[in-house]
Each structure stands twice: as structure tokens, then as C-alpha cells.
Amino acid sequence: RKGLFQVFRQKPASYDRNRTANLESRMRTADTNRSCGQKSTVRLRTEGHPHPGLRPRSGEERIGDSRPMKMTHSDLVMLRGNHKHAIASHELIRVKRGVAIAAPKQSETLPRWEAFSTAAEARILAVARTMRRKVVFTRESAMLIHGLPCWAQNPCVSIRVAGSFTPSLLPGVIMSTHQIPAVRLRSTHGTYTEAQPQRIGGLLVDSLEETALQMALKARPLDAVIAVSGIIKALSRFDRFRQPASRRHEEIVKAGLLDGLRGLGSIPGKRQAEAVLTLSDAGCETIGEQALLFALATVMPYEIHTQHEVVIREHSYFLDFAIPSLKIAFEFDGFIKMGEDHDSFQRAHRALLSRQRELEDAGWTVIRVAWEELMDLAALRAKLLGRVSKCTSAPIVSPA
């Protein structure tokens, strides 16, 4: 794990695009001057595997906890010159030149996250509708089509096409009171596996295995860990109530991805990708937990366990993260866990307090992390170090 700390080491500064870009630049291997367009395909190791997680799939099978996109091609409106009034009155929302969608119903109460999600899906469909050649969706776009969340709230649309391609800008979107900035339509070059693209909802999309390597090699560190953790969770069909089998499946998936990566030779981003694949954990159940995993791994000198089971008075509790030797637990307070209405929130809150009391009575220290704290990883790391230092009565030295 020490090697992971060396790769993911960050200065104590807020996580923003510039600092992350600098970090990623430092993490790139010395051969970054080589062309990224070189195609290198490797067959992922699947022989004799008891679990089909790494075998190429076809069709529209749902994987693990994935959810398909809500929008379909039928939601698109092709603009033919007679929609000016509808655009001006915001009945239609332009998502790409010549393509719009109908304004969502009850848009005045539309949550911010749903507005961004709708725009991201509409942009993918609009690109597919208007491209005059075969297009395969990759990276964050592939994740959304597979039904897996990505960290970027407003992701670029990533595609792979044969021949040359000039990146372009997809316009900003105004949806009710939400202003969604413009994003790039960009092309990736080459593939890293022999898995064939899949067709999901009429869209050609990279396999999850290909997407995992694309994200591990090319995405920013935080985005990469979140993406690969989600993909490994889906491929291994992780179930915390069946952990021995789930962990074996997780190891198979990871081994296949690492074998594929190591067979690629010397390529930019390989050091980061190996660290990402090693760190990523199928036991993270939500995108918030995946982000917290990254924060913990880049600051803690201890081995972190996910979904650690603790039995108290015949009750089993699964801790999001734990340092068992110190009896320290880290719990992420996500929105989904707390329910969607007042009554369910109150029930969840009472259960949370009861759970915390039982854990503390059993000698555990529970450190809670809220969603808002993930927005400033430097401050979150400082908090985590401070709390753990108090528990150990000694300062914690973050690995260099």
C-alpha cells in the first residue's frame, strides 16, 4: 500500500481542477511524450474463471447495480426551423445544434442533480443521432450508458470514431433555474482490450472492462478511483452479505484488469492506472463512499477495510470503512441512506443513533463524513488525521 501513497500523494490544498491536473501530470510516467494514439489490444485473462465478470458480453444485460439511462431516442426533438417559439419560451431545450428535448415536467422543482443528469444523457443521445459515421461511446459517457455514476457532475461526451476527428463544444443548457455549462465533445484513440463494444439502448458503448482501463489510465486520480471501484463492484456483483464469494470475484476481476494493463507495455499513465486498480474496492456501495476511499487512502498509513462486519448482541453491523486494529470506523452519511421523505428520514436517523451508540459501547470510535466534506479533500484529510491522532494519542504521519 505504501506505493499507492506515493502515487496519490497530494499537497494540503483544496481539490480543484488545476491542482488535480498538476498531480496527474506528476503521476504520469516518464514516457508521456509518446503518442497516446497507439492502439494496443490485450485479451483479458478469463480462462478457467468461475465468475464471468471479465468475459466479453453482448446484448443489453444489466450488470450488478447498474441502472440504464432514463432518456431514450424518442425524447429527442430534431429542430427543423419551426421551433423558434418553443425554444424562446423554454418549452424546448437545445442540447446540440439541431437537437432539443422537451422541458421536464414540474421543472420549477427539478433538483439540481437531476437537471445535470438529464443534460448529460440528452447530449449523448444527440451526438449519437447526428453523427454520420459509426461512433462508440467511451469513458464517462460509457459509464452513464452502463448505468454507473461518475464523479464529474457535467461530464464531457467521449466517443471513439475511425479516422480524424475535430473536438467541438456542446452548448450550455438552461433547465429551469439551473445553468449547465457547455462541455466538449472529444474523441479517444485506441483500445486496451479485445472486448467488443456492446449495444445498449441502441448505443454502441465500450465494455466495462475497456472503460475501467480507459478511466484508470486517462482520468484524474479521484475520478479514476471512483469509476474503477464502481465498475469492479458491478463486474463482481459484490454483495456484503456474501463477502467471501464476493471478494473472490473481486480478486478475479482485478487480476484480469491488472494482467491486461501490464501487458500493454510502456504507455502514459500506467503507474497511475496500476495504483488505481490496486486501490479500487468493490465494497464501496455509493459514489460518496468511493470518494471517501480515495481520501482515506491518500492520507492514512493504516490498512483500510471496507464493509467490515461487527457483531454486537447478535446484530451485524457493516462499517463503511474500518481500521480494525484501532477499532476506528469511518461512516459516510449519504442522502440515500437517510431516506427520501420526512418519516423515512426520522426512522433512519433514529436507527443511525442507535447503531452509533452500540458501536461506541463496544469500544469503537465512529468518525462520520458528510457529502459536503467531500468537496474539499484537503480539509477532509486534515479532519481525518486529527481525529485518528486523538484516538491513538500520537500524531499520525501520512506516508510520503
Language-model region placement:
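Surface segments flanking catalytic/ligand-binding clefts of nucleic-acid enzymes
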Residues: G53, H73-L79, P244-A400
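Intrinsic disorder/low-structure terminal segments
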Residues: L4-V7, A13, P301, A329-E331
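Short gly/ser-rich loop at a beta-strand->alpha-helix junction or flexible surface loop bordering the NTP-binding
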Residues: G3-L4, F8, Y15-T20, E24-P268, ...
